[in-house]
Amino acid sequence: QTDKVERVIYEKASGIGIGAYTYGQQTFIDEKGDMYLMCTGAYGMNPKYKTGILRIKKGETEFDPTYNWVLNDQTIEGESGKTVWLLQSQYAGNGKMYATMDIPSYWANPTSPNWFTDKSLISVEMDIYNKTVKKLQWRNTRILSCLLLMAEMMWAFIRIILQPAKQARMP
């Protein structure tokens, strides 16, 4: 095994801008062995590049032409705005993923976000198999606070996972 680049692959049909934010889990392999890549879409700053998710099927070396999930026009249950940036994500198993998304309708200046003050970041639960997104009922936050929010999300997820085990031990 080496770190040598063997080849470069492209997916142009969806308009998804390849590249990932440097925090959180930006690629993962699900239980089926398929690899998913979170794409930031130029951090939401250039509408030419969409944010979304691409997949490489197990045993393949190209992006799956049957799966590209553009999130810019995705309906988000519990949220009227649309996203321009899939910021961070964490795969939880069985097609469920928890993530943060930037929603421009919360920007004070509609043409330029202020990531120090705009509370435009929402937390979501995503189903990568059924392509659904649901807003979690947590407060919006600033993008620069997202690392703290991601830690909060993971602790909540851990509590959800451990709760059934705790209840099973109760008399």
Feature-to-residue mapping (PLM):
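Beta-propeller blade signature
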Residues: 1-3, 49-61, 113-129, 169-170
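Blade-level signature of beta-propeller repeat domains, shared across WD40, Kelch, NHL, RCC1
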Residues: 159-171
